[in-house]
Amino acid sequence: MVTAHNVTTKKDIVKPLQYIQETTNILTTPTAYGTTPTSSPTFVAAGLNTEITLNPDVVHQDVDVLGSEDIVDAVKTGELYTFTTRFNPTDSVLLNYGLVSGAGTGTVDASLSFIFSEKLDNTEYFTILKGCLPTSTTLSLERGTWNADMTWICKEITTPATSHGLTSPTFVSIPTASPLTHTDAGSDPFAWNSTATPERRFSTTVTRDMSVLSVNGESTITYAKPTTRRIEFSVDAFVKNTTFLTDFKAKTA
């Protein structure tokens, strides 16, 4: 018979998901990639977080030999880490890491470390996500609050531990700021071809390709940097002229 135990739910999150820059620019300081600042780090809330999904993957190679119909071993050859987060943004700071062009601090040129803690069987455990870079950012709005979904590649997601290993960190508590809504930008927030256009639904996705350095002798990736950015969007707009169709036919950017 299974013994009853304390199941972890959203109420067991103690310190919400929060982050800090590892370096202002991994292009000029690549050795800082994947290194969480340990001396008096000050963390920033990752929006009004509603969901986080960790995706660790152990890469292995099957060992198959003559004389046996079964594999005789499955050898670990590497570790790959990604995670996704869903949140209601209270500002554009975290979003800019995924949306805007690389330009040093506050953009995709700067890798991040995330941390959160949760109660596991009534004991607080910390998880640190190191060397995080955004590979996909989706921002959507439908006459309510802004919703954001971000996918990140990581160098490492640590095993939950009762000690975070940081010296005098400043953590943020559960955020209480109001999320951004469809009215925060005023009336007619959407413009097409320099013309204000009424719409009721909008979504944009920015996808980034990463160049990843993985070498013999290391189980995790050594370094990663952004290489390509692709932007797409969709909008449910009310048609009041022929501009959309004309621009579509002319392939006008």
Where are the model-predicted features located?
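Signature of extracytoplasmic/envelope-associated structural regions
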Residues: V2-A253
